[in-house]
């Protein structure tokens, strides 16, 4: 019951208190895929300079941007593993410098996924107030502190809710 309540809270009010430049979840604020920022440049200069670059490993998920931070997920394969073992992680980056502010990791094995899908997390993180929510490719749902990356809670959707495992892994962003 408590987990259901927590999941319900995650679903409620996902757009309150955003600044115009935030893109805190899949498809942006209110999931409309509309950016209502004003003052957008209409013509880009011929040569743009990269402001910052941060290497991340494999995955399909898009970034979430909120209150000066960029949240991304990836999968780091264990090169010594023959069974597709590795580590998934959420990174919080400073949006101005790209500095890694924190990283939250968990061990995982993609051996139950089709090999062609064993490339990393698929779900864009969601930011709401002081928590960022991330879904792992194998169905872990994590609630992390936006400022520190400390885990507030996590559930295993497969075990805790008897959910089946898609052959391509879990790909729904937490809404």
State what each model feature region is.
Residues 15-175:
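Noncatalytic, solvent-exposed loop/strand surfaces
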Residues 4-14:
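Sec-dependent N-terminal signal peptides
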């Amino acid at each position: 019951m408590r987990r259901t309540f927590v999941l319900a809270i995650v679903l409620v009010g996902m757009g309150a208190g955003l600044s115009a430049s935030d893109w805190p979840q899949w498809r942006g604020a209110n999931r409309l895929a509309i950016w209502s920022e004003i003052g957008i440049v209409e013509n880009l200069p011929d040569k743009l300079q990269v402001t910052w670059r941060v290497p991340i490993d494999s995955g399909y998920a898009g970034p979430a941007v909120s209150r000066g931070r960029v949240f991304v997920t990836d999968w780091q394969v264990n090169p010594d593993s023959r069974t597709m073992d590795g580590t998934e992680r959420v990174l919080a980056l400073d949006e101005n410098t790209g500095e890694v502010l924190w990283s939250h990791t968990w061990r995982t094995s993609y051996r139950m996924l089709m090999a062609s899908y064993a490339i990393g997390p698929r779900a864009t993180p969601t930011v709401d107030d002081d928590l960022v929510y991330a879904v792992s490719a194998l169905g872990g749902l994590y609630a992390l502190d936006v400022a520190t990356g400390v885990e507030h809670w996590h559930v295993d959707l497969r075990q805790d809710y008897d959910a089946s495992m898609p052959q391509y892994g879990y790909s729904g962003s937490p809404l």
